[in-house]
A protein has these predicted regions:
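Short glycine/threonine-rich loop-to-helix capping motif typified by GTGT followed
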Residues: 32-34, 63-74, 146-152
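Short connector loops at secondary-structure junctions
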Residues: 51-66, 100-101
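A short helix-breaking turn/cap at a secondary-structure junction
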Residues: 1-36, 40-41, 59-62
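Acyltransferase
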Residues: 33-56, 82-87, 111-133, 161
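Short, well-ordered beta-to-alpha junction loops that form the rim of enzyme active sites
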Residues: 24, 57, 138-141
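Glycine-rich, small-residue loops and helix-cap segments
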Residues: 1, 106-176
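Short helix-loop capping/hinge segments that flank enzyme active sites or metal/cofactor-binding pockets
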Residues: 13-20, 71-123, 138
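A short glycine-threonine-serine/GTX helix/turn-capping micro-motif
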Residues: 7-8, 28-29, 68, 85-88
Length: 176
């Protein structure tokens, strides 16, 4: 990642490693830079002996519906920050506060349902990747935009923020 060669003797044995590339959602909206870097990494892994296969992962497309009533992140952030926000909201970035405050709307019943849905989702994803050693996907779909392009445009900020968080969210939800 740093553009520097890997020292000799530090390469993992990838002979016959079974790697899955999920094709649902995580490869959407890739910019040319990320797409080229990801493809290059996959080619290097394959050249080192890894067996790479693209697989459907429809469970990834289900995550927005699972999180429709709220997310773990919002609930946990609200539980931690609510006292500070109630007394010192101006010390927070307003964009961050708005997201944290979504956690206040999550009921106990919603949270318990979310826990159960997460367990079902994890089981489904684990069943789909059974037989693979790991999943491969870009961490983010695009190179991060310049901050100055987001400061004055709320829609651009939330669109970019959502894209940057999208792929890591799947792994976090898997407790990966």
């Amino acid at each position: 990642l740093a553009g520097q060669p890997i020292p000799p003797g530090t390469h993992a044995d990838l002979q016959d490693a079974r790697l899955a590339i999920p094709t649902d959602v995580v490869l959407n909206d890739l910019d040319d830079t990320v797409a080229a870097a990801f493809e290059s990494a996959c080619q290097r892994l394959a050249a080192a002996g890894a067996r790479i296969r693209r697989i459907a992962m429809p469970e990834f497309a289900e995550l927005p519906a699972i999180n429709a009533k709220g997310t773990f992140t919002a609930a946990e952030a609200w539980a931690w920050h609510r006292g500070y926000i109630e007394n010192r909201a101006s010390a927070y970035d307003p964009r961050v506060v708005s997201r944290i405050q979504l956690g206040a709307k999550i009921t106990a019943a919603d949270f318990i349902e979310l826990l159960a849905a997460r367990q079902r989702w994890i089981a489904a994803v684990q069943a789909r990747v059974a037989g693979f050693d790991a999943m491969l996907m870009p961490t983010v779909p695009q190179v991060a935009p310049r901050i100055d392009t987001l400061v004055a445009d709320e829609a651009a900020y939330f669109r970019a923020n959502g894209l940057m968080l999208r792929n890591p969210t799947f792994i976090n939800f898997l407790d990966g």
